[in-house]
Amino acid sequence: MPDKMPRDSSHEDPPQLGPDSSSLLEKDQLDRRRFLKTTAAGLLVSSLAGPVRVMGAGGSDSSFQSRWPADVERYWLGPAYWTNPLQDWRLADGRVEMIGNGGDRNVQHLTRQIRAEGGPLDLRVETGFLTSANARAGVEVGVQGALAEYRNNAIHGTGLKAGHTAGDRLFVGDTEARLDRAPGADGAVLHLTTTPTEDGHTLTLSVLDAASEKELGQVQKTGVSAETLAGNLALFGGVDEGEVSDREWGTPKLWFRNWEGQGAALEAHDERAFGPILFSQHTLSRGTMKMTAQFPPMGAADGSTVRLQVRRDEAWTSVDEAEVHERARTATFRVTDWDEGRDVPYRLVYDYRMAGGSRTDHYEGTVRRNPVDQDEVVVGGFSCAMDMAFPHPRVAAGARAHDPDVLAFTGDQYYESTGGYGVQRNQENVERATLDVLRKWVLHGWAFGDLMRDRPTICLLDDHDVYHGNIWGEGGKHVDRWELHNNGGYFMPPEWVNAVQRMQTSHLPDPYDPTPVKNDITVYYTDMVYGRISFALLEDRKWKTGPDGFLPPNPGRPDHIEDSDFDPSTIDLPKAKLLGERQLAFLEDWTADWRGADMKAVVSQTSFAQVPTHHGGNFKYLVADLDSNGWPQTPRDEALRRIRKGFAVHLGGDQHLPMLLRYGIDGWNDAPYNFCVPGIAVGYVRAFWPEDGGDNPQTDVPEHPGRYTDGLGNKVTVRAVANPKEDFAAENPLRTLTNKSSGYGLLRFNKATREITAECWPLLSDPAQGAEAQYAGWPQTFSMLDNDPREPVGHLPRLSVTGATNPMVQVVDEEQGEIVYTLRIQGQEFRPPVYADGAYTVRVGDDGWQASREGVRPSEGTGDALEVSV
């Protein structure tokens, strides 16, 4: 038989792949046997691994029967199965049909596994071919990936195949035989048994005619080790006809029915069932709780609504009901007047069809109390998850150990290559493309759902989330040909983009201004107040100008500048946009609004600077990368001036290079801090290896600290950076990822001291080892006030406030009519700094402006006081 087609895909960030990129995204499988022999057991299943749910054997009855319903049609087969890829399988007429071409399409059984000890095994399944092409079908045993974890097995695993072809062959691995004749119109029964012997296991495959039950052929393979058999079990199908067109997609090629298994080799893991409620995300802000439940593609016979219930007085009470969105497969709840003062257990309730009638699925979690009285609020920062180490057990376990109050996923929750089988980047069949992106997104929830169910989650989209290497949104513009995508705009259809945004962001607080952009593409930029931390959640890409056709011609990629003589002022052009006027107006309002907040943070996709100097697996030197928020420069400065008004730190990702930066606008260190968190699993590597050392280096921080001017002319101070190893490849994929500077970050907001601590944790770190386990240069602590570090020209008279503790203070330049800054002070006294001579209005209040003084001027003395009562 031909070798199995690989499921895994490129480890590199694929920004320039075209629409039909399946072949480019496939790669050779990891040698999992070699990996298992060389990996210490404690590396993967350690004290950190609790939330990964690597369970022991379940109940004593490990036999199974598929029992697919005859009266249900849908793409999702049921909670015990995972299909690769989702869009190439469907349930119809009581059988599973493969509706796409290609090699190694498969159905993974999630709740049954073959023991490492081996033993007798008996598997049966009916199957039939609906094409005369070179097709094959059968069962696969011992499916195992590099991490020896059932979800990793399901996505990246290889196993031993036993099956038959549409011609006259049957096979177990590389052992083949011929059928006496082809099965009849009713198909065949495949019967696989494993029998332990002194020399291993003997596998016997018999093919029977389904109608007559007459044996048509048999083949045996001897000497198979228990290690080879251990792992997942699956059905597989393959049709070698090339990529199926959108018009042909949906026509069945082959089918399976009545899959059964029994024997001592099987172990039950019913706790691994997945769906139909796959995972949820929620936020809690200003008394309103929003939650989105994610579903697989259900059918017309299944329920169309979902109930949200909370536990009160030992009973479940329904508080909201929501429709399942037809395209996004989500249900979003919005509950006002939420009880923020206590942990609230919740469950989602959904009715669906399986064999025997209706079933009810329950998904439970907790909406935690709002930690308003907690001195420290911890935010976990995550981005950029290639799938080679799915389900990212060390990141999930590390996050669980830190127990952050808020999760922040800043973009690239998946890549075009995630889950293998290429990418459906096309505009013709929106449903097929939506199923493709849904399977990639669901992997994110499968990895981190146990964390998200119990804590507020910020989730923002970046370029790869909408199938772009770089996305220049230009206010919702549409691009009708892929080769024009660098001109600006979205290639994927607006209804697809909106579905993806609904999947990832519909649980966020209501948008600041919900008016859609061009082509009716929705927006989600908003604010969230939780634990008395005020967050601004931005969309870096939606309004950004595309470089191709806008900037002067540039050799090579329009977003990569390689000319060392390049003058960055030549691309700082009028009309170029970054955040856009709407988000700038939002930031102006947000920085002035401190109701219910003690500290502020901006969360967005990427940094407002171009720091990495070397890119890609060969570490190619680049002067500038226009994908960063360092370009366009003037809008970049405008954004930072607004963020600075609220003393807000900036949290983001995208760069695949952990960095702690201090922005500069007119000079160095006159703008906020930025923490660019590591990628969860880095593919495309970047490094900061400047040719010259920075000015004024920080001697206590390793690797090129100091003041720099980036390739776009922006001023930036590098406080810490965790560069990858030049020779990053390792046999252990987790070690490779750590060598590429993968991991996660934390921001700790200390409301008592108004200090912020940035922590940067390598992928293979152990939080129990303390701060020394972090990347060199971290942790670092700085004051909230350091986010507006300008040198004042003077100070207004000292404020002495009565009637409020820790009041809000706002300073307004009367000549310019502009807010200089707003903050919530500590205590009742504050001497406001100002940065120009003149008259100022000072406003003071608790959760509203209750007092103001106009015409206040800088005072040279320290004894002058401005008494204010609120």
Give, region by region, the residue ranges found by the protein language model.
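Carbohydrate-binding surfaces in secreted/extracellular proteins
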Residues: 125, 183-221
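Flexible glycan-contacting loops in extracellular carbohydrate-active proteins
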Residues: 216-251
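Secretory/extracellular carbohydrate-interaction modules
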Residues: 100-174
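Long, structured stretches of catalytic cores involved in phosphate-ester chemistry, encompassing
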Residues: 255, 260-264, 286, 295, ...
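N-terminal secretory signal peptides
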Residues: 1-31
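N-terminal twin-arginine translocation
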Residues: 23-34, 43-59
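Glycine-aromatic-enriched beta-strand/loop faces of beta-sandwich-type recognition domains
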Residues: 140-196, 712-736
